[in-house]
Amino acid sequence: MSDSKVNMVSPPEGLTGEGFFATKLNDVVGLARANSLWPLPFATSCCGIEFMATMAAHYDLARFGSERVSFSPRQADMLLVMGTISKKMAPILRQVYEQMSEPRWVIAVGACASSGGVFDTYSVLQGIDKVIPVDVYVPGCPPRPEQIVDGVMRLQELVKSESVRRRSSPEYQELLASYNIS
């Protein structure tokens, strides 16, 4: 995962012993967030079946901190969009995203969510990044559970390295404004 070294320091005044280390609050918050992501599956086709396998005992996504699958956007911070999204479904997906509290992350699982897949028609959204910002793309049609786990692990690395203040930065606000999200 991370190759950061632990900075061992001498104990604070008045204390004796070994094993004291110094870190930044940013690192602690990043580690806590990365290992406690609550997924919200938004599945419309076969990628959802692969996600079910990912949550089952053999692959067990809970080992990576995603113990509690939420079916309420208000209680989730990781949106997994799986499958074909029609243009009529796009406003609903966007509404689900907007109902999630900050910080929130999005994983586009499979070819359909990433680029429309084989459905290059007038009624299919050609990638969910047309309506919401995406943090990680998982390729495949459908992707194997191992690939979904890898996508979650990549998101964890992104979350760990993200500054506590990034979500309130002008750059992030500009990104949301480009999607007309306040």
Curated annotation (Swiss-Prot):
Binds 1 [4Fe-4S] cluster. It is a peripheral membrane protein. GO terms for biological process: aerobic respiration; electron transport coupled proton transport. It is an enzyme of class 7 (translocase). Disulfide bonds: none annotated. NDH-1 is composed of 14 different subunits. Subunits NuoB, C, D, E, F, and G constitute the peripheral sector of the complex. This is NADH-quinone oxidoreductase subunit B. The gene is nuoB.
